A protein has these predicted regions:
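Thiamine diphosphate
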Residues: 16-22, 29-32, 42-54, 145-197, ...
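Glycine/aspartate-rich loop-and-adjacent alpha/beta segment that forms the canonical ThDP
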Residues: 48-61, 246-296
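Core alpha/beta catalytic barrel or barrel-like domain that forms the active/cofactor pocket
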Residues: 126-129, 134, 158, 185-199, ...
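N-terminal leader/propeptide and maturation segments of large enzyme subunits in energy/redox metabolism
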Residues: 68-152
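Residues forming the flavin
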Residues: 173-201, 206-220, 240, 256, ...
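Conserved thiamine diphosphate
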Residues: 2-10, 66-80, 84-101, 205-255
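Flanking helices and flexible, charged tails adjoining ferredoxin-like Fe-S electron-transfer domains
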Residues: 1-18, 22-25, 49, 74, ...
């Protein structure tokens, strides 16, 4: 599968970009990305270019970013806007099915689209079939309802990329909403792009900026806090430790009909890894084997 992410400006061996590459391989042609200010904005969209690209059909991730403190709300707004558009389209389609003068073939395709409109698997194929059928119907007659349906039929999956600390209130609000959003957290355990300052993601005893004597408090258990809602899909992954579990967790999170949170261990330049970030995947493997990072 072709990744729809290329030529990033990340540090060589960055622990974050492999996850983005994988996600765009799986869902890139139908993704909406909400990205907060930070490393993942710097390496993905350093002016004048953006690292997200399109496939041979012109389909690719729709990317936007906001400030650190309001990115969950920003991404949630993207989701709600698209959800409203799709709900309106579904209503128009049902009106056409009930009383519209449409062919049996178009009727069948519309019914199939309505039945699977919230399923990621096969969505591109259903959209292509619907588009072709609508083009044929519009060639035969000028129908405003059919035109409205055709223009908006390519809105599918929503996704929110976000960070760990400053925007937690917004993240908590979005996860508590019960809506079908997906959150991927790159856990570098420090503020990476500003020089490696300690945060609530930093573990006890770690030496970082603002914690020169070792961090005194515990690391926030973000996964456990999300689990307390009872309806959030939560996974913790490390690509270097288990590619199979990483792929399985991301696929399941996207398919889950509700909020999902994936916490991805991401070795960083600020970790001072012996041998450099060329060993980042091996470092992730060691972290899991030592019990430092849990997979679930």
């Amino acid at each position: 599968l072709k990744p729809l992410f290329e030529f990033s400006g990340a540090c060589a061996g960055c622990g974050e970009t492999p996850y983005v590459k994988l996600v765009t391989q799986l869902f890139g042609d139908r993704m909406m990305l909400s990205n907060s200010a930070g490393c993942s904005t710097v390496w993905a969209a350093g002016a004048p270019s953006v690292s997200y690209t399109t496939d041979e059909n012109g389909h690719g991730p729709a990317w936007g970013f906001s400030l650190f403190e309001d990115n969950a709300e920003y991404g949630f707004g993207m989701f709600l806007g698209v959800a409203q558009i799709r709900a309106t389209l579904a209503l128009k389609m049902r009106v056409l099915l009930e009383g519209g003068d449409i062919s049996a073939a178009l009727r069948s395709i519309m019914e199939e689209w309505l039945e699977g409109k919230d399923l990621g698997e096969g969505t591109r194929e259903r959209a292509a079939a619907l588009t072709a059928a609508l083009d044929e119907a519009l060639a035969e007659k000028d129908d405003a309802e059919l035109k409205a349906l055709r223009e908006k039929s390519d809105f599918f999956v929503k996704r929110s990329h976000w960070a760990y600390d400053i925007g937690y209130g917004g993240l908590d609000h979005v996860l508590a909403s019960g809506e079908d959003i997906n959150v991927l957290v790159f856990d570098t355990e420090v503020y990476s792009n500003t020089g490696g300052q300690s945060s609530k993601a930093t573990p006890t005893g770690a030496v970082a900026q603002f914690a020169a004597n070792g961090k005194m408090s515990r690391k926030k258990d973000l996964g456990l806090m999300a689990m307390s809602y009872g309806n959030v899909y939560v996974a913790q992954i490390a690509m270097g430790a288990s590619q199979e579990q990483t792929l399985k967790a991301i696929s399941e999170a996207e398919a889950y009909p509700g909020p999902s949170l994936i916490i991805a261990y991401s070795p960083c330049l600020n970790h001072g890894i012996k041998g450099g970030l060329g060993n980042s995947q091996m470092q992730a493997k060691r972290a899991v084997e030592a019990g430092y990072w849990s997979l679930y």
